Amino acid sequence: MVKRLGLALAAPLAAFLASRLQRRANIPEHLLHHVAFQEDALIDVDSGRLLNQVLREMAADEMGLPTNVAADLKTAVRPLHRHVGEARPVEADGSCSHHLLVRDGNSSECILPQRIDVAKHYIMTGGPEAIREPFEDMVSRVSSFGRYMFNLTEMPVVEQLFAGPKFQRAAKSVCPNSKQVLDPFQYNFILSVPGQTVALHLDAPWFLGATRFQFPQWLLAVMVFSNLFQERFVDQVQVVGYLHDRPALDDDSGGRFLYYDQNSATPKAVLSKPLSGVAVDGSKTLHAAGVFRPSVKAPLLDKDKDNALFYVGDEKWQLRSNGEVLQIYNSSDLRMTIVYRARCFASEEDLGPKQWCTVVM
């Protein structure tokens, strides 16, 4: 009798334990259930050609495309408040001894990177793909290359992207119904080499009175997660568009756009087809990219060195570290994206006070 009772209870007990032990995301409710909009051919062929030309011209200059850590220091903005007290002097050799600190541009201080929140989460969890490897390898995996630009008038082809009907339709499907006036403000080029990924993250949030022009981005992300400043939160929409001309990246190539709209162990995934795009409010929807060509080991990049990707012509690219060429790639080896963003406002009148947050401090 006891044996039969034990057998009868075994199956439901096993099912209960399995449900309790199943891996799941732990995302606050206010960061779930937001809209993501995907469209093939979101970028027209002519715009794609011009954007690829602009990208190569940028990557051919003396700066090239720095890693994302360096790009925040070199090509984005310098916040009024660079740190919250963690700054330490650089070592005699110019390095930062603490593994989580980086040099603050050309200054004599080491500070937390702008997105230490993203890096630390990835190192501790391995991201959606639960990667486990040495610290230096993980840092190299998420050190993609790019530039951040805020002056849209310098790039007519980007202005045309924002004005086009496809962006307008996608953006207005993401912005709240009560905030359908769009305010374009930023675009980025982001390139990944084989073995790299884009770690799970929120995009730099904007609040009335608190933006990346005033405070470190990791602090702004903390404000979003806390849900204590919602009355000052500025909704936005970003489009991740794909500029590589290779066929859609399949399961073997990886590099898909990943996002969480529910607390599930598995994120939703979208193929990175050429000239397609995904529109989402990345400042309140956690998103990432799968590892691009996961069978390839990403090049080891020392955080204390000047690492950048350069276009050298004839569809060839050089990865350099302190001027030394570490690797040569073909354009077909790279995952290429443009990310362009607009804020969502309720009326044209709301656009007036925005100027305070677009002035570099």
Where are these regions (language model features)?
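Signature of the catalytic double-stranded beta-helix
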Residues: 118-232
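N-terminal auxiliary "cap/dimerization" subdomain that precedes the catalytic jelly-roll/cupin core
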Residues: 2-167, 332-337, 343-361
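A short catalytic or substrate-binding loop motif that flags glycine-/basic-rich loops and adjacent residues
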Residues: 180-181, 231-235, 249, 330-332
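Charged, glycine/proline-rich intrinsically disordered loops and linkers
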Residues: 90-140, 201, 207-225, 296-325
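Catalytic core of Fe(II)/2-oxoglutarate
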Residues: 246-361
